[in-house]
Amino acid sequence: MKALIILGFLFLSVAVQGKVFERCELARTLKKLGLDGYKGVSLANWLCLTKWESSYNTKATNYNPGSESTDYGIFQINSKWWCNDGKTPNAVDGCHVSCSELMENDIAKAVACAKQIVSEQGITAWVAWKSHCRDHDVSSYVEGCTL
């Protein structure tokens, strides 16, 4: 009986954690979904951004008390401007997507929204990119990956 309970908690923790991509796995996925070079942003920059935003975790969330909004998913897309979580006051929902969809293991919708954000605001829309990737050598993020 104890073994079943422990097994149940293990499955629950995996479901709550979501998918944590390996670096090269994410590089291949982002390339397949068309982010490599999209709007002039290299694949290495996208990997740097997602490393610092979410540690490559699809279920990452971060609440922002000042704006009463939450950042969701592997790109940490904000509910005030880009997705609908049903609880953020005066939300815009610029990507016309549910925030929960941005946390799916299949990151196609998250990538589509990231493309919209970078098209409208550039890569500088992400604070983590400005802090950790801009003006840095980001080539190590794709180093050793078979693309």
Curated annotation (Swiss-Prot):
It is an enzyme of class 3 (hydrolase). This is Lysozyme C-1. The gene is LYZ1. Lysozyme C is capable of both hydrolysis and transglycosylation; it also shows a slight esterase activity. It acts rapidly on both peptide-substituted and unsubstituted peptidoglycan, and slowly on chitin oligosaccharides. It comes from Bos taurus (Bovine). Residues 19-147 form the C-type lysozyme domain. CDD domains: LYZ_C. GO terms for biological process: defense response to Gram-negative bacterium; defense response to Gram-positive bacterium; digestion; killing of cells of another organism. Monomer. Gene3D superfamilies: 1.10.530.10.
